[in-house]
Amino acid sequence: MQLSAPKHAMTHESRLDRLLRQLLWGRRTAALATLQTLPGAETVPFTTPAVSFVPYAIDSTAQVLVLHVSALAAHTRNLRQSPAVSLLITAPEDAAQPVHALERVAIQGQAVLLAPEAAASARAAYLRRFPEAAPMTALGDFQFVQIIPSVGRHVAGFGAARDLSAEELKALLTS
């Protein structure tokens, strides 16, 4: 089910902001990059990127992205070691269009693992987008994670790329 972008109260929104808002609110999955620490050859820890595929929601009140993660997942262990993350959200591929022009946004940020008593807003946002996940939200080994955006890079096509500040990203996460 494709979700449409929320009605936005701004009187004028740039074409690139409109495209990015539609991408963020219209897609439901992202690639999540975390930092994984591996044992080194001489007992020196070695940190390497690790990528997972995750569903995400948007908590427009808190202006964050929301994940629901299992304690068994490698990315959850990684988040406990380092909160630095990157999310990559892409438009669907179109066989008639070059993949190099595929619209996408990479969002760097900090992950905050939420205690159950602090997760009401995140849970509500997640269940609005994924009502079928309600039974999973009651499982004890799952928890909600807020991704607080720091910076981003939006590519809307050839010659249409821009850097985004935390403030610009948060404005696009507001309904």
Regions found by a protein language model. Give the residues of each.
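Surface loops and adjacent helix of pleckstrin homology
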Residues: 35, 70, 90, 157-159
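An N-terminal domain-cap segment
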Residues: 2-80
